[in-house]
Curated annotation (Swiss-Prot):
Pfam families: Hydrolase_4. It is found in: Membrane. GO terms for cellular component: membrane. This is Uncharacterized protein YqkD. It comes from the Bacteria. The keyword S-adenosyl-L-methionine does not apply. Keywords: Membrane, Transmembrane, Transmembrane helix. The keyword Membrane applies. It is a single-pass membrane protein.
Length: 305
């Protein structure tokens, strides 16, 4: 009997340890420092940081529904209400959004950039990969609509987790959201993405690790992995979506975007970049990326004339 109790105790201890460790890795994923991001972006030819410091911009702070502040910048040099909101990826911050900011500014659009919860200057204790972030994005969109007096077009560009956030937001705000979306390298389902990363990084099976981690994720973070699923809401999105992914992405497979594109009804476009790893489609394919985005934006402008 004593051996049985010891075995049960050891099993319970192991389950708790697994749950705490893996849920901690998800909720408190290590973030890049400003120095890391600046070095990476500069090494990749994005010399945008000094110009941002000198650029005229308006800082903003808005309260999240979850009790922290969301911080960002509105950059509006053009005489137009048309604006792109840029959502950065996990572990990043607004510094990673600057290359996209310059792309859209060059194309004649104003830009709003901000830090997701637990990233950059924004508050928040945990990362939820789009689950809570989509509601913060709703606050940002409302701020922008008030700034522009509900005039002009609003588009949302997201990279990686930012793309997931944009799609989850779009699925929840079909009639009162943005006018269009650009989703660059999103995952289709978070539980599938976690299973994929477990195999790729640790050579570990998803069972029983993921069910245990998922229980603790709900306990500690308030959400389950299956609740973070663009694929589950993509058929609700009526507004146009441009999907982007590099074919050689080995962090989030290109098949994720292909599945989302296939299931999306209504206006949509797909650009599979020839070069670049995860979240590097613009960096490694600047001309074709810009051309694809410009054509998509031109279609948005034409549809409102």
């Amino acid at each position: 009997m004593k051996k049985i109790l010891l075995a049960i105790g050891a099993l319970v201890t192991a389950v708790i340890a697994i749950g705490i460790v893996f849920s901690h890795m998800i909720l408190f994923i290590k973030k890049k420092t400003d120095e890391d991001i600046i070095k990476r972006e500069t090494d990749n030819g994005h010399d945008v940081f000094e110009s941002f410091e000198q650029m005229e911009k308006t800082a903003f702070v808005i309260p999240s529904a979850y009790g922290y502040d969301i911080k960002g910048y509105h950059v509006a040099p053009h005489d137009t209400p048309n604006t792109i909101i840029i959502c950065h990826g996990v572990t990043m911050n607004v510094l990673n959004s600057l290359k996209y900011m310059h792309l859209f500014l060059d194309l004649g659009w104003n830009v709003l950039i901000y830090d997701h919860r637990r990233h950059g200057q924004s508050g928040g204790k945990t990362t939820s990969y789009g689950f809570y972030e989509k509601d913060d994005l709703n606050k940002v969109v409302s701020l922008l609509k008030n700034k522009t007096n509900h005039r002009g077009l609003i588009g949302i560009h997201g990279e990686s987790m930012g793309a997931v956030t944009a799609l989850l937001y779009a699925g929840a705000h079909c009639s009162d959201g943005a006018d269009f979306y650009i989703a660059d390298c999103p995952f289709a389902c978070f539980d599938e993405q976690l299973a994929y990363r477990l195999r790729a990084e640790y050579r570990l099976p998803s069972w029983p690790l993921l069910p245990i981690a998922d229980f603790f994720l709900k306990l500690r973070g308030g959400y389950r992995a299956r609740e973070v699923s663009p694929l589950a809401v993509i058929d609700k999105i009526e507004k146009p979506v441009l999907f982007i992914h590099s074919k050689d992405d080995d962090y989030i497979p290109v098949s994720s975007t292909e599945r989302l594109y296939e299931k999306k009804r209504g206006p949509k476009a797909l650009y599979i970049a020839e070069n670049g790893e995860h979240a590097m489609s613009y960096t490694k394919n600047r001309h074709t990326y810009r051309k694809t985005v410009q054509e998509f934006l031109d279609n948005m402008n034409d549809s409102t004339e």
